[in-house]
Amino acid sequence: MDTEYEQVNKPWNELYKETTLGNKLTVNVGMEDQEVPLLPSNFLTKVRVGLSGGYITMRRIRIKIIPLVSRKAGVSGKLYLRDISDTTGRKLHCTESLDLGREIRLTMQHLDFSVSTRSDVPIVFGFEELVSPFLEGRELFSISVRWQFGLSKNCYSLPQSKWKVMYQEDALKVLRPSKKKASKTDSSV
């Protein structure tokens, strides 16, 4: 799948106006394309799409993300797409790490999955694996960094995820034990 993104500098007010117009994606159902808005996930509204074909695929996903933190905070994170129709929150796609102190314009041409029109399809876009080199960057994020769309009126609970921004020293502590285990097994061989 081709993913393009750019990060540009613009005044926050201008970006906010652009983003409030709504992020959209194009859903292909059978032979027809239909634009679907991405809604902040604290709104429980789901969008109903005319289900005329057997399978639904997604293409031409365009997302504009305004800076949520100061660029000086140095916060980065990956944008995940998850199917939340069950508690596992199956990963459908993940971008590379993005600087969340800048505007992000993300374009995804085609996603490598399809879903049956007979099933409910709640999809959530959200930032995960957030990292900051500064201690102040830990508590800067909330549910507002998630978007959702769905083909059902049912409400779904989001899978549990860690929303705290990880401090880089903490990240190193998490990685060190696995490196030690690997070195012990290497020495015993």
From Swiss-Prot:
One of its GO terms (molecular function) is RNA binding. Disulfide bonds: none annotated. Changing E103A: Movement defective. Loss of interaction with host protein HFI22. No effect on association with host membrane. Phosphorylated. Its main location: host cell. Belongs to the tombusvirus/aureusvirus movement protein p22 family. It is found in: Host membrane. Transports viral genome to neighboring plant cells directly through plasmosdesmata, without any budding. The movement protein allows efficient cell to cell propagation, by bypassing the host cell wall barrier. Displays RNA-binding activity. GO terms for biological process: transport of virus in host, cell to cell. It comes from Tomato bushy stunt virus (strain Cherry). One of its GO terms (cellular component) is viral capsid. This is Movement protein. Interacts with host protein HFI22. Keywords: Host membrane, Host-virus interaction, Membrane, Phosphoprotein, RNA-binding, Transport, Viral movement protein. InterPro entries: TBSV_p22.
